[in-house]
Amino acid sequence: MGGKKKPTLSQLAKKAEKEKAQQAQKAKKEVKKEETPAKRTIQVLDEKVFQAIAKEVQNMRVITPYEIASKYGIKMSVAFKVLRNLKERGDLVLVAKGHRTEIYVPAKRS
């Protein structure tokens, strides 16, 4: 009844070339991955960073959690908590609150 036929010599050669090219690309990707270090984010905030954020926030026009998270390398959830804490302390005033974000201004500017 037949079955699968044997590949021709040219087909075998093409297959071998493709495999070599794929292996070369894999090796290239692995080298690339090793060169770029992963960006670390802070999950738990220490008092020193909190004080730095509190000081910096007073000089900004508007403050969003994304700005704080990207500037200090912290998670968005931590940035939300920091800004809410600063609001409770009276350093910030909530201007607008949407579904996903909150916009604050320093208390002295409001």
UniProtKB/Swiss-Prot annotation:
Q: Does the keyword rRNA processing apply?
A: no
Q: Where is the composition biased (Basic and acidic residues)?
A: 14-38
Top-level taxon = Archaea
Molecular-function GO terms, alphabetical: structural constituent of ribosome
Q: Which UniProt keywords apply?
A: Ribonucleoprotein, Ribosomal protein
Family label: Belongs to the eukaryotic ribosomal protein eS25 family.
Q: By what name is this protein known?
A: Small ribosomal subunit protein eS25
Native organism: Pyrobaculum aerophilum (strain ATCC 51768 / DSM 7523 / JCM 9630 / CIP 104966 / NBRC 100827 / IM2)
What lineage does UniProt assign to this protein's organism?
A: Archaea, Thermoproteota, Thermoprotei, Thermoproteales, Thermoproteaceae
Coding gene? Answer: rps25e
